[in-house]
């Protein structure tokens, strides 16, 4: 990504996560954005997803099966569900990368703690060519 953007380390503040998805409006991604905006002076936000993303079509059910295969017990999963975690919402993927980027841009743009003067842009980077396409 830095090569596609023509930036070096330190030129930008990067927040990375699986799928480029904001899974909670007051989670760590938004917290990191708030720090970047209010403490580090960031004025522009770029949401960049990549083609062939591993989070595309991700299934909570399938991931839970992978967890169990790696030794996570059903009782642990049940206890976490009992504590209020909805695995289907928490571990969801997406089917349409462009739609997902638009939803993430919208979530940032309309967040009550993000100032209206912050510019938020969406992009998809081609995993094979590095080409960046604006959404």
Kindly give the residue locations of the regions a language model identified.
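Well-ordered alpha-helical segments embedded in enzymatic catalytic cores
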Residues: 31-35
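Divalent metal-coordination and catalytic microenvironments
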Residues: 15, 47, 130
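Divalent-metal-activated hydrolytic enzyme cores
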Residues: 20-26, 37-40, 55-135
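Short, ordered loop/turn segments at secondary-structure junctions
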Residues: 50-52
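Short acidic/polar active-site loop segments enriched in Thr and Asp
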Residues: 43
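Short, conserved "active-site rim" segments that organize catalytic pockets and cofactor/ligand binding
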Residues: 1-30
